[in-house]
Amino acid sequence: MNKRAARTVLAALVLPVVGASTVACSSTDAEAGSAPPVLVQSVLPVGEANPMIAEGVGIGASAAVYKTSGTGPSAANTAAPQGSPESYIDTATFAGGVLPAGVTVTEAQGINVLRKIRDNLEAQGLGLADVTTMRVFLDNAPGTDRADYAGWNRAYRQFFANTNLETGDTELVPMGTAEPAAPLERNPARPNRFALEVASLPVAGWLVEVEVDAVYPEGKGPR
């Protein structure tokens, strides 16, 4: 085993119809053929009970993969000017488009986007727990010099990577500057992910656009 492999844990994501879980899988077992092949194998950092993302994800040759298009937020906040970043605040979470203390527009748009992705996946017989890869594009809000990565990451933790891998307990997640609380959706999945700032996004007012890949549970495929 090389030094890099020694510093990582190979965790096989078992993807049943009802969700996903992580289990340890040693290379010795795999070489001996004592363990069945897995659809997805995530490489997670050693010593971290609650990592945000995987270091990498391996997809088995037999896996059926669903890829979403780039998804931005819906214009749900009719109280804000059309085409403004505030018009894309998720009113299902923030009544009237009013943001609590510390919640940023990027954070609110991120929640909006991840709800849409969840609905997209569920229409295909999938869920957020089946997501293996995520690509995130952020624009900076008007009057700021840099994309709001912290706000995006808070939104992300509301739907992903919010369980303790050692105990299985739900991890509490902050929203804005509020005290950490139960996430909007409990999900142990840690996809591989990139997040980067772009010069602009295709729709006026969008600060967040996301696309994901998800693997169908064993024995299932596109509808």
What are the roles of these predicted feature ranges?
Residues 1-12:
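Bacterial N-terminal signal peptides that target proteins for export
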Residues 10-112, 119-124, 129-132, 142-223:
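N-terminal presequence-like segments and the immediate start of the first folded domain
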